[in-house]
């Protein structure tokens, strides 16, 4: 035990010891019922971790530590989600490069030391190499932070979503989806990010409010009448394929089945009826364009309309006019739009409408919700592309209902989060697009045969053998072909796309557990016990993982989902790097306050509850950690064999028994909290007792504890102190792992994190299981139950302290007389603790008087 207790440097000391001793190493020889397995969220490797990561990962770690102390063999791996768009963007910004797949590989390429003014184009292979190199550096920094925070993961179980095993499992799962008809290739309207030039799934959308204008356009009916249509996107007028109104809208019922002519381009389009048209929006009749939004897609599909694409994948209008625009004047008008961005094309289209007299009135300002890719900075467009899909219930009510039922089998913490899952499933508008037109990801494991003219046959994909996985079709050759046949007539071509990162991270239980590559391990850990994650990715990670497990195993991937809330800034706004209000780095917090203090703040946030970022809470946590060390030093100063091997049978004094009985209730409450995933409740009840223990019990028992160890009353104090300390250190251990390990090491063998979770019987149980801790000592001839003696003694001591404080006297000043008035039972109870109260309060004389009132102390200072 050090001469002076200190928190400085204990993280480095104990992290090293835990690693050397294999404290958290998973033992795969145990059976499934002995295992508690956790599907740890693999953080996205796209820069630095933020305080939200520290917050939520601490919650899962507290649960892992509790389960380990309860006797479970905890399977707690760590993964890195190191492929996909966020990683690519990180590499682009870090090095100042841009991937150009048309460029040849440069084996001697060295990235710029400083990002150039304009991105430097490099080959795909060079770009992927940069991605791999930078993610390794980032992952080392991530691991260092997690170790400093005290995550009790088994680092030998670490995986990365781009490593060979993960890629093989991801490709294998996709091919099995394909074999069962759950994956398919289709040409369809696709949400498209024009900056990243890739498809985007529904789960990755984000609505952002933007200021726009309604433009009133004049169409002409077949009878020559004007039909006013209001739109916020006049630049899509050349893509117009129909007008639509509600079937009950009497203003337009006479027009259904007829045609109208578009302004400027003079293209006839049908006038249709559809129940999704909104009579109270604008003029009540809308133009259907291919494609302005998802409603256009729905109308186009259900009304069997033609396609007139105008928007290119680069976000600019296509160079050639769409079908239908044929006369010279219309073609000339379109030429003025070709090649312009959507923003510029809108301004030009308004000019054309004004010039033709087809713009009625002035544009009217409006606020509108515009869809963005959650990581993008330009509005999404909808373009027709060939993409791979996985069926997710978006177009299948039966599958959707099955996934709702599956969600109801899952235990949700907190329970109300289930409604978010169900709302998402019920609102699915289409199947899941899993292909991405990017570079650093898991390749789609498919080739296509080329016919004699060199055109791909998408109906007959070439698939790899299972034993060959993982494959990269861009460099690997399919069975039966030679690489010289690549891109040659009669040869083959690779699918150029990679999978959405969620397509791989939706398989984290399978990847961590070794599905198809380590059947023994997988059988011991799957289905997993816990999925901890943030609530905002229920729609992506949680749902996708549920879907893949449902398709592959027809069961849940885990038993419980633990959802964490957001971290809020002082203005009650979510803290995030994108908002610019998350400037404090986790490592700086850990350095300033200590890991246990930061964990204390994190565990103060209940599941699913948004929590304020509060360094004040961290200061309280640090004070608590220091107090734990000081309280331990106080208890261990008593040289007594009883301290080393305490037993409840050694506890004979009523005050000591009362304290242990109260602590036994805390053990029960803390245990219930953890089993219900309410770690905050466990912390609160333990901390509340601890401060009372330090402020009241230690003061009350101090004088007696310094007595002769041969005195049974002194031995009782020593045993009670040791039992309480041993229990408190274990109760705090899941939340405050470093300080509890430090204090434990001063007087106990092994690690506190491998010690058993405290049980009530350790504190109050007799051999026959009878709880006698809160009863009058049987040597006094009574079995009458006594109310909380510790509370009674603490109340009298508090009155004595208050009297001294008001008189501005030292707490060691003597009390000439303590007079107690109260009922006979209360006075008898006080007699059992009188010795300790008198010693703690420095009381010379005590008088008692029976009265039908609550116990009332009167203090006469000396």
Curated annotation (Swiss-Prot):
Whether Glycosyltransferase counts among this entry's keywords is no
Q: Which reaction does it catalyse?
A: tRNA(Val) + L-valine + ATP = L-valyl-tRNA(Val) + AMP + diphosphate
Q: How does it assemble?
A: Monomer.
Q: Where is this region: Disordered?
A: 459-494
Q: Which domain of life is it from?
A: Bacteria
* A Gene Ontology molecular function term of the record: ATP binding
Where mainly found?
cytoplasm
- Motif placement: 'HIGH' region: 43-53
Write down any Gene Ontology CC term. Answer: cytosol
Has keyword Disulfide bond? Answer: no
UniProt-listed GO biological process terms: valyl-tRNA aminoacylation
For this protein, the record's PROSITE patterns field holds: AA_TRNA_LIGASE_I (PS00178)
Q: Which protein is depicted?
A: Valine--tRNA ligase
